[in-house]
């Protein structure tokens, strides 16, 4: 079950996200970053946001550390988008990962990006117990990315 949760970015976080997005647009990936482009669910216009692309167990995933963001809502509505890095564009279909399958993906995400996202997860650390991660899993949508 998904629990509605959203952590609004601070001014400093918006500035940092803008910097990461600019770097990704010119082809520089900061520790796996990409620009996610997805059509707006109401406007149909392309909307972009920097994201961390997780490669885990032979698949690619997008995790929403801030919860029910606009990109999450748009991706749920469209089911597809693009990951951009410089001039490269990877069109994909998105499948939301169910609660029963989130644990290993969230654990891998936290292991890689804990330093960056810890403030969005109410956890003791990246090596938190399974039960602790399962408790907050509903607040953080996860999508499998299939080219």
Model-derived segments and spans:
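N-terminal short leaders/motifs
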Residues: 1-13, 35-40, 89-100
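Alpha-helical membrane-targeting segments
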Residues: 1-33, 111, 115-128, 135-137
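Short, flexible segments with low predicted structural confidence
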Residues: 15-17, 46-47, 81
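Intrinsically disordered, low-complexity segments enriched in polar/charged residues with Gly/Pro
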Residues: 22-27, 38-41, 61, 68-70, ...
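Short, flexible turn/loop "capping" segments at secondary-structure junctions
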Residues: 28, 54-55, 85-86
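Short beta-strand segments
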Residues: 31-66
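Short, structured beta-strand-loop surface elements
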Residues: 59, 66-146
């Amino acid at each position: 079950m998904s629990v509605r949760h959203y952590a609004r970015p601070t001014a400093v976080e918006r500035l940092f996200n803008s910097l990461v997005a600019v770097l990704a647009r010119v082809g520089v990936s900061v520790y796996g970053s990409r620009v996610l482009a997805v059509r707006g669910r109401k406007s149909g216009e392309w909307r972009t946001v920097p994201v961390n692309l997780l490669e885990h167990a032979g698949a690619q995933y997008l995790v929403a550390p801030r919860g029910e963001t606009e990109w999450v809502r748009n991706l749920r509505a469209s089911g597809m988008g693009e990951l951009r890095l410089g001039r490269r564009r990877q069109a994909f279909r998105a499948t939301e990962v169910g609660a029963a399958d989130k644990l290993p993906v969230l654990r891998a995400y936290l292991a890689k990006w804990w330093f960056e996202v810890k403030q969005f997860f109410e956890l003791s650390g990246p090596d938190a117990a399974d039960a602790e991660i399962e408790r907050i899993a509903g607040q953080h949508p996860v999508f499998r990315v299939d080219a």
